Amino acid sequence: MIPNSSAGGQSWGHPLRNVDNDTARGDTSQAFNRPDIRSEGQQYTPALPRHPGQPAVIDLTSSANDAQEGQPPAKRLKLDITAESSANPASPTPATTGDSRVTPGIANSKPSALSWRGRPVWSFQAMISEVMSGAEATEEDAILAPQGKRPASPPPFPQPSWKGAPPEQFGSNATKASESDSSKKVQTTPFRVEVPSIAPALKGDKVADFAPWIGNHPEDILSEQTVKQGHYDRTQVSQNESNTARPSLYAQLKHRSGLQMLSSVFMAALEKRQNHNTINVPSNFKPPPRVTLTDNKREAWLRDLANPSVPLRRLSRTIPHGIRGKNLLDQCLSKWIPVNRAVWLVKCVGANEIRACKRKGTGGTLVVGSEVKWVRDWTSGVQQFLEGVIGACGSADWKSKMTYATSLTARLFFERLLDHDQYFAWFLTSLEGASLNMVPVWLLMLGIYWDSMLRYRKRGRRLAEVLLGKLHQTTELQRPTLLQPLAERLSCCIRKLVLEHTSSLILPNSWETHRDLILSCLNMKETADKTIFDSLAERNSRIQLPSSRSDSTRQSAHQRVIQLFDSIQSSQDIASTSVACLNALEDRQTLVIKLLEWSATSFRSGLHRVYTAARLLRKWKISGVDIDTYIISFLSTVQDLAQLDMDNVYHIISELVRSQTFSVSRYLQWLMAKGVARKSSGTSGEVLAADARLLTQLPMSRSPEHVRNLRLTLLARAGVSVDEESSTIKCLKSSISQRLPNIFEVEASNSKHINFSKHDLTWAVKSEVSMWIRQGVVKHLKDTTRISALTPGEFYCVREILERFGDCSILADVLKQAIECDDNIILASVSDTVNYHFDALSMIGATSDLFRGLVGSYARLKRSGNLSLDFVFSLIELGLRLPDESGTVYLLRQDLARIESKSALAAPSPLSDHIPTTFNEVDASFQERLEQLLSCGNGLDESTMGAIISSLTKILTDGGGAAKVSAKDACRYLAYLRPFNPKYLDGMLVRYVYGLLKSSSRPTMSQVLSPLIGVGCVTIHSFVLLVNKLSASAQTTGAIANPDSLRLDILELLLPQEESSADMVTYRFRLAQQEFLVKYPEETLNIISDAIPLFDADFHDANLGSRRPDLPACTVVLLRTLLAQNSSLVLKYCMQKLDGHSSFTTVLGKAVDILLGLDPEDEMEPSSQAERVILMNNDFSLPYCQLKLKLLFNAKAGNEVKNHIVDVMFKAAVTDSRSKRSHWVGLVSLMDQEAARQIRERAEGCFFSVAMFDESMDDTSLPSGASSLSSIESAKLYLNIIEKLAYSIPQAGVQSIPPLLVERLDLLLQKLIIMQINSNSVAASSSGSTIVSKINFERALAFWFSALLRLIVLHRAAFNVPPASGSKVDSLREQTRLLVSILCISLARLPENILRLFPAADYFPHTIQSHNFRPCPGILLQTHALDVAASLIDSFPDEARHQCVRFLRERCPPFLKFQNDRRFLYLLGPMTDTTIPSSQLSASISSPAAGGSTPTPIPSGTLSGGHSSQATQQMAALTGPFSGLSENTKLVADRLRIQNGGRINGPYPVRPWELLEDAAPILGVNDTAVSLKLFDARRVRA
């Protein structure tokens, strides 16, 4: 008995057999470095756990002949085999012809964790990795591979094998290693012979000077000669030759024919040798037959199959019948049959089943169908088997069973024993429907099929969507602790998809849904991740269809800049906005022009725009922008003066001149060079043009004398009176001096009163007068020694003049001087003025300084005890608008509360008991006694306070009347009474106002409430809320008398007052009006909407009465102001009020007409109005044009009017597109879907009517293709319109578009073929005209190909509609033609690589490319075309894809060079080489050498039409001299072909079911499924 001391070791005395089964020869050199000659079915499978009931196997034989031999003693173990030597692919591995060896030590252990691959324990990828690779491995390699480092100290030296078993240490270590964790390193390995690295290699994988001892060498045989003389490795020969061939050879060489004769002799010898070694025996391969066995014999046979020591040749004699399908796999699992032997059984059963199907069939088609059906049924059985194992999760030995089932299924898959399409479809469906608990199991299996599944788009895209769906489902549950590992694993898979299989994430229908999810899986800090994601996002964006109108109306750069301008009013951040504007628009001239237009347009309001523009221009001037040139250019080219307030533009320039930012001398030089021009006004003779008119607006106060003289000279040349400007300034100064005699010296003058309207005076005049006023105020304040240098009246007058001028910068200087006064009224007025002009002064940068100055004056007056409540109120209101001054406002409120509490706690005076009886508002001493009472510092009781309030409210009701106190003073006294008892005062005022509302003879509420609002006792908002509350209850109680009159009172309360005097109370009321309009625009619109119906003729006489006669006109102006102030909110409100509000619609139309510069009284036809509105739209007027069109569309208009509007809109769309504008899109969005569809269809008709290529382009004698350039530009316009209106395309698509697109692509392909032929014919010519013609053609080709691809994307749905039964063939033909055209054009290799350029609508190569020309970075046009093809293939049926593949292979010879291009294989796969082409059903196709007669996809013929040799040559020209590829490129599909008379009969169909080893009991010479005679195989003799 041989001791089993080295389980798993190689028998040292066992000779290795060669391939020919020649056991008599013991050539051991074949055991080393033998190449892998086994089939894929014999590849390595990891060792599987032994079933608990299975006995241990000790037999180490590998064949039937060796199984009968006795086992010699085991060889001594060799220690310290390093990991490198065992992992080395050149390490010796025994070659076998049967099944792999499985040792008992491994059979008793659990599956190895395969830690050397660095994969987690749960990954099945390592278990089938050897199946995927081409290297051969055995189970012994799996034992050797996990070895670790060299042990620190070697174990004791082992005893000889014949003296007993080795030390217990080795056996115990081996046992422990097999039972321990899989990651633990094995300490010892069996002895293996190593080939020295320096040994020279010989032919036949032999090694020289190296013969390892195997026990039966000749020197081991003891004979008499060996004992006496020793052993010699070569036979001794005598030193002298017995005979020589020299004489005979010399005699032959002397003749001329000697060499030829010798050559013939040697050739005859070689031929005989070749014929002798050639295998001529026919193939004797037959699948092993199946026999019927009893159950016991069947179980015994299966147990023998599970035993690796039983050779397969012996088992092949008695394969039991009745084991098939899922039952076969269950038997393999229950018996733990090794995977490679289980696959052998599957092949045997499958081969017999398929042959049985062939015997039943009568025709070729029926046989193929039966075989396919059987394979699909078998695949279903495998799926059921795997589902059963997965469903048993959690049971005993589930992990081992899952490992076996996964390994066996993967082996079947990679052996091509399954229907891959069906298997992958089931796999993806199962993964998609799996619960989150089972997803990890499917992910482990996914690692096995990862590369195979992502080889084709059909599976890769669906896998990507399934993984993204599972990740979305995981993140939605919000269980970070439990699902975080799963989410990380899914993210890792998705990231690997993005980085390695980017094209699988081209998702035409779900990109927007999964975009953020994909982004979350990447590390955007990594350059690779960011670059690939940007490219992926761009590729997806180019094949997306706009799903809504908002997608089609994206904001342009001009609109973004305008939005930034509008945001300054709220943010007040000039620095960041300046940088943002420069970054948003690269064209600096356009940026400056847009800023000037924004500041002057009538569709915006506010004086702050002037100072915003001035500050931005100063910032840009510092940044290096040439604002002088751009401003002058704007003035010389401005045309739409009706919608621009040019006074604002001149104001901006005057501010720039004051700050020396604008160069006056440069402007004068430009004007001299240009010449002063006049512009006809049509009525009043001639006026100066806008650029020359600036000459009259320039302030000259700080300019040198020679510049002033030059300006006067140019004014004289322009016909402008020079004396008129100086006289106007003199008259203004004189008039102001008369009104302010204390500040300015009054001179005797006969000058009349000058109108201070800013439209009547130039900025040269206003600037001169304003600076004179500022200088006078400053001088007056410095010279005076009085407490208050300015009186309130003087301050009001100065403020009124500067406000009429609109010169806020000078006003800010005057306010800064007025802060030094000690008059509370002036300081309160200064605070109110800053608050009123808050936006403009903030843009100037003076708001914070003025507020701090006012706070300083407040502190000064507080210390002196001369503080007034008016000043405190105004200062607090101003501080509330400054976010940085919240602390100061808090202190001011504390002081105000302290004052009010002090007044409330003061004791009433004893004299006040008699006051109510003696107080009378008619009394002359009423005001004096009231001021004495308020200033005495004593308190007031409620009765006294009530008497005073009653007297003051009576004065307020009568409007002053006979009382000595005015209504404004009465309201001021009411405000002074508030600190004594605020609650009582508010109650009295509420009762007073409520009494007025109930009174039928109440006065006009605007006269009563204006002063109350001015002093702060009542607010407009609180009064409106009170009226609304009472109106809600008035329906039942009648609380308000004459509510219609009250509505008009409220509206009149919001209108600007006519009085010109602006004292403190009036000015505060204006401030309150401004605040209400800004904060409550919706309430204002409701007030206007309620009051407008009362303007009708029925109510006019009764309601207006003594009111303002211009109330309707003022209402229109108020509504226009609201539209300009808050356009977005007001426009939205107006859109909602269009239906059912005829009166409001009428007033709104007038306000919009005023904004648009139209005449409200002009009664034009709706169609004419619509045409005029459409043509005047721009970046600023767009929302108002939309509103005007909406008003027109709501009017009763017939179909003729609507059709006319559609015509006008289409013309406007073409005009705007030509001008690079997109305003028309917003106007079309107001129209219904039908109108947008009509406009789009007109654009499509015009697009398809444009000639793609003119005849002049085909003539190489012409220098350029100017006509083509114009056609390209026209096509661009129509394509832009189609893209913008893509939302009007129905979901079902437009069925008339696909045929047009297919025909256009065919025409494009035909032109490309003709151009290639012409290029080949004139290749020798290198004239300039030829080069330009080629470039023009390629430029046109790039555009039309890109444009047609875009239309295909937009109308993709039309290709996907399932056709009717009668048109199914035509639809399939169109789909195939479309794919063929796209692939052939994208495949074309043009001289200038035009198809590799960026497919942007606004980028095309120059006519003559510069020397340093480089393509624009981005997505290549070729890549974009393939992405479009991928999006089509996703929705096309498989039949269209298969027809496209068949067509390109059979009828497109140039495409044969690119069949193995990974991109096309990815798109059109899976493509089976065994599929019989349609042309082979009747006759064999031509060989590649005979491609001249093969038909090609010319556009004129359909896929089933006729073809010509000329067309073939044309198609072959696509890849002619410019392809750069060899014509003899070998294809994978053509490597196995049957040659018959020089013709190829097609690829030989290799059947994986017949790739069986050990199929026959006796090994024959030609025992192979593929007959060796077909390949002229020869015997290889060692």
Curated annotation (Swiss-Prot):
Annotated region Disordered: where? 1-114, 146-189, 1479-1512
Does Repressor count among this protein's keywords?
yes
Chain ranges passing through the membrane: none
How far does the signal peptide extend, from start to end residue? none
Tell me what gene encodes this. Answer: srb8
Supply the name of the protein: Mediator of RNA polymerase II transcription subunit 12
Q: List GO terms (cellular component aspect).
A: mediator complex
What are the recorded Gene Ontology BP terms?
regulation of transcription by RNA polymerase II
Q: What is the scientific name of the source organism? A: Emericella nidulans (strain FGSC A4 / ATCC 38163 / CBS 112.46 / NRRL 194 / M139) (Aspergillus nidulans)
What segments bear the compositional bias annotation Polar residues?
83-100, 1499-1512
